[in-house]
Amino acid sequence: MPKLKTRKAAAKRFKATGTGKFMRRRAFHNHLLDHKTPKQKRHLKTKAVVDRTDEERVTLMMPYA
């Protein structure tokens, strides 16, 4: 059986944790930041855990993570 390929787009966006979960960046922290409060921007800077409903899809895209 051939080796499975990693989806490079997913590899750039997600990082596996030691427990097997995946971390992701938050949306809405790219541009149009003038009207957002400093607290909101600070919160958007932090990483988030991928939801359990999406974990299987990310795992399929990154088989060796």
Curated annotation (Swiss-Prot):
Q: Which GO terms describe its cellular component?
A: cytosolic large ribosomal subunit
Q: Which InterPro entries match?
A: Ribosomal_bL35, Ribosomal_bL35-like, Ribosomal_bL35_CS, Ribosomal_bL35_sf
Q: Pfam families, from UniProt?
A: Ribosomal_L35p (PF01632)
Recorded superkingdom: Bacteria
NCBIfam families in the cross-refs: rpmI_bact
Its family remark reads: Belongs to the bacterial ribosomal protein bL35 family.
Q: What is this protein called?
A: Large ribosomal subunit protein bL35
Species of origin reads Synechococcus sp. (strain CC9311)
